[in-house]
């Protein structure tokens, strides 16, 4: 059985190609940025921590990837850099090996999700990995689930991929796809 992060990558890889612009809304250590850079024409990656940019740039350099723009700003500013996107990924929570008090916040995450949903091309997808075992994580989890569950079903399909028998708040995946055409009925 695939782990949620593997499923997230597969979900995006099904639709992203070398002509596409994509977003890594939470750069972190750069694993998703590198994954997307190997698939897409251009990656816009966001984080508010300098350490994230440094680690990501190092990872990209080692792989000789030059098609990622690393942006030291919150993901809620993505519309200042991106006019349309084929896909996006969020890893919500905190940067491993960094200050665990610096966490993604419900307000800015929802703002970023709203903007990315609007900028998605038809057939585009968003993968949201939700880590919620830390203080404040449950609030963000609930805000994201509330936002996604209210997306217009004529425009989007949304699903959850999660393990049911794991303890200690296992991370789970929320998937959004912008429909190719409106469905009626």
Regions found by a protein language model. Give the residues of each.
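Conserved SAM-binding motif I beta-strand of class I
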Residues: 42-47
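S-adenosyl-L-methionine
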Residues: 1-21, 54-84
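Conserved SAM-binding loop of SAM-dependent methyltransferases across substrates and taxa
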Residues: 29-40
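Conserved beta-strand signature within the Rossmann-like core of class I S-adenosyl-L-methionine
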Residues: 119, 123-130
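Mobile active-site "lid"/loop adjacent to the S-adenosyl-L-methionine
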Residues: 93-111
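Class I S-adenosyl-L-methionine
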Residues: 137-185
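Helix-to-beta-strand junctions that scaffold the AdoMet/dcAdoMet cofactor pocket
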Residues: 17, 65, 120-122
């Amino acid at each position: 059985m695939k782990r949620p992060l593997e499923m997230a990558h597969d979900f995006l890889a099904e639709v992203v190609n070398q002509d596409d612009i994509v977003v890594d809304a939470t750069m972190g250590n750069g694993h998703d940025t590198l994954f997307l850079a190997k698939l897409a024409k251009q990656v816009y990656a966001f984080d508010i921590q300098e350490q994230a940019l440094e680690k990501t740039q190092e990872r990209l350099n080692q792989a000789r990837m030059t098609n990622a723009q690393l942006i030291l700003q919150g993901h809620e500013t993505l519309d200042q850099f991106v006019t349309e996107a084929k896909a996006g990924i969020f890893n919500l929570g905190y940067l491993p090996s960094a200050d665990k008090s610096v966490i993604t916040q419900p307000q800015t995450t929802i703002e970023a999700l709203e903007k990315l949903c609007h900028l998605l091309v038809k057939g585009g997808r968003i993968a949201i990995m939700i880590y919620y075992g830390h203080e404040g994580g449950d609030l963000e989890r609930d805000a994201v689930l509330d936002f996604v569950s209210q997306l217009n079903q004529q425009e989007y399909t949304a699903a959850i991929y999660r393990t049911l028998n794991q303890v200690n708040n296992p991370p789970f995946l929320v998937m959004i796809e912008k429909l190719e055409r409106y469905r009626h009925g």
